[in-house]
Amino acid sequence: MSTMTPAEIVSELDKHIIGQAKAKKAVAVALRNRWRRQQVGEPLRQEITPKNILMIGPTGVGKTEIARRLAKLADAPFVKIEATKFTEVGYVGRDVDSIVRDLIEISVKQTREAEMRKVRSKATDQAEDRILDILLPQPRAVGFGGNADHANDDNNATRQTFRKRLREGQLDDKEVELDLEQPSAGMDIMAPPGMEEMTEQIRSMFSNLGSGKKQRRKVKIKEALKLLTDEEAAKMLNDEEVKTKAVQNVEQNGIVFLDEIDKITSRNNEGSGGEVSRQGVQRDLLPLVEGTTVNTKYGMVKTDHILFIASGAFHLAKPSDLIPELQGRFPIRVELDSLSVEDFEAILDATDASLVKQYQALLATEDVQLEFAADGIRRLAEIAYSVNEKTENIGARRLYTVIEKLLEEVSFSAGNHAGECVTIDATYVDRALGEVAQDEDLSRYVL
């Protein structure tokens, strides 16, 4: 679990997301509260439930990006799902319990990787010993007394020399033959949506077939060392302990990001009696968010302390269109602001992995130097903002379309301009995009 303070979390989010201070503070406090709860004594700890968050704002302003970046910072089981993927129990489609099943799978993978990192040093030593046994087979014990001891000393000295060369990478390209445990044969089962649990049970039933068999392979020492290290580390793990820790990690630290929650409101479903009831999905989500127990192949998982962050644009609906019980389960509401020209400008140039830096790096691979003048970036931001105002407002995603159109010619003929420097200023932007941006009909289809 992350031990970062709210200020540190916001500072990390600021490197990738422009503006939206209120939303950043809300998720930072929620994440920190997970750590605070763990420091509270046991009788009271069980009573402290997470305060779920509802993020409201137009598309393309950073709701999903905040969740994506939070996942990397959280160091906790995290799953992002679209609410529109689920259907009411009884209809064909995924049911909401699969959210917890996805979360526990992610947690098992995380826990296994963490446990393997703990034993990797010891596993590497054992893998080196196995490779040295292949390169330097133990000599047969011939003779007695001093001769045998002398032979052992020589053999140990040789092994240490080879171990040093192995660690320095001098033997990487040499090939060796070794017996590796054959992975259990995976079984692909085609099943209709909503029957994932049954499919998993059948797959796990067949997964043990053929496990434990050895397969002789000829590989380079560099690859052999990695394969043997993984094999030795896996032997040191206790699978039951990994599963127990994974379940506990989900129950105490799990985070679920529910995107597009506005698309399952009752208002969006008016007059569409033939469609699957979206209000039914809300009713199915309710016990999950309130706290229930879900049966998974790793055991029973309680959802009482899982943090839920929901988001939606709420263009056609309002948060009050959600069923009252579900509204009450998202006590913290944060409104995200629409992006201004200055925000677009900062997104283009001020973030750690800005679009400008990405395109400069891409074209640098073909020895084309791309320079963006300040007035060029400003003009790009103005055009993106203007097109959003005239047509559909898709937020920062408009920048992808605009900059792709701007650099279309340069990207196409980059091979012919190796060693050259291309400067993108306001004049260049107007020449490439001016006509399209001003013509509303053209910009509707091109930008």
UniProtKB/Swiss-Prot annotation:
Which SUPFAM superfamilies does this entry report, sorted A to Z? P-loop containing nucleoside triphosphate hydrolases
List locations, semicolon-separated. Cytoplasm
InterPro entries recorded for this chain? AAA+_ATPase, ATP-dep_Clp_protease_ClpX, ATPase_AAA_core, Clp_ATPase_C, HslU, P-loop_NTPase
Q: Which GO terms describe its molecular function?
A: ATP binding; ATP hydrolysis activity; peptidase activity; proteasome-activating activity
User: Any idea which positions bind ATP?
Assistant: 18, 60-65, 259, 325, 397
Checking Gene3D superfamilies in the record gives: 1.10.8.60, P-loop containing nucleotide triphosphate hydrolases
Give the CC-aspect GO terms.
HslUV protease complex
Q: Which UniProt keywords apply?
A: ATP-binding, Chaperone, Cytoplasm, Nucleotide-binding, Stress response
The protein's matches in Pfam families, at most eight in alphabetical order, are given as: AAA, AAA_2
The Gene Ontology biological process annotation of the record reads: protein unfolding; proteolysis involved in protein catabolic process
Per the record, the domain of life is Bacteria
Q: Which CDD domains match?
A: RecA-like_HslU
Per the similarity annotation, which family is this? Belongs to the ClpX chaperone family. HslU subfamily.
Q: How does it assemble?
A: A double ring-shaped homohexamer of HslV is capped on each side by a ring-shaped HslU homohexamer. The assembly of the HslU/HslV complex is dependent on binding of ATP.
Q: What does this protein do?
A: ATPase subunit of a proteasome-like degradation complex; this subunit has chaperone activity. The binding of ATP and its subsequent hydrolysis by HslU are essential for unfolding of protein substrates subsequently hydrolyzed by HslV. HslU recognizes the N-terminal part of its protein substrates and unfolds these before they are guided to HslV for hydrolysis.
Q: What is this protein called?
A: ATP-dependent protease ATPase subunit HslU
- Organism expressing this protein natively: Burkholderia ambifaria (strain MC40-6)
Phylogenetic classification of the source organism: Bacteria, Pseudomonadati, Pseudomonadota, Betaproteobacteria, Burkholderiales
The protein's gene is named hslU
